[in-house]
Amino acid sequence: MPHGTLYDPIRKKDVPATPEEHVRQATIQFLLNEVKVPAHLIAVEFGLCAIDSKTDGRVDILVHNFRDGAALDKPWLLVECKAPGEYTWQALQAQLNRYLKLLRPKYVMLALGDAVRYFALDGVSLRFKPIESLPEYK
């Protein structure tokens, strides 16, 4: 492996080893190995233009919900990753709120360095409520 890069098993290529990329790759390994998400359902740096052609920006990680027949805008999981010290939880939440104008995921994961927060969509209130961890993908 060349110095200064990490191998991304989803994009199947080496990527620059930035602090944020370290968080992203650790999150991908967590999703694959602990949550048991099939690799083919994971999208890295998912372009929001796939949902709305007038929208730019990218979601760090999206886990599609195709098994349940869900549309592209209703993923199983939306993940935002940031290197420690780059963002506050409030700034990360504000960025996430912009994505939630287009996407309605079942779960949300915020990874700020080693600190992680999880949320689940409440089907009645349509609000995200904190949860202890993600369920295993089924």
Where are these regions (language model features)?
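A short, conserved, highly charged catalytic patch centered on acidic carboxylates
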Residues: M1-Y107, G113-K138
